Amino acid sequence: ALPPIEHRLQLRPAGDYFIIDDAFNSNPAGAAAALEVLAAFGEGKKIIITPGMVELGEREYQLNFEFGGQMAQVCDYIILVGKKHSKPLYDGVIAANYPLEQLFVAADLNEARSQLAKIVEPASVVLFENDLPDTYNE
């Protein structure tokens, strides 16, 4: 059997909650599949941390907007990373009438992790979807 690829839908325990690490290079099909995996967990809060997708050309805004709507259907909490870059995701989440008190925008991954620490609880499942270098964040 082939070993799993690092940061490709890797499920791992983190104390009393779980992490789905899908931080390696996100694309629309992969991001949707990762959300399906997250949705399949019955118990616990479903949380996503993502900066969105990059290098999608002229459809980048639209594809991220749509992903925002998909996240709103599945996630109990959404933590976006990078205020400027995550705007299309934010717009998609808002368009889906997602509760604002469950939506957070972090400047960087450290701030996202701090926010996560405030909301995570036992049996939560946290999806890390894509990981951008700090050059994309402000």
Task: Write out the residue ranges for each language-model feature.
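ATP-dependent carboxylate-amine ligase
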Residues: 1-138
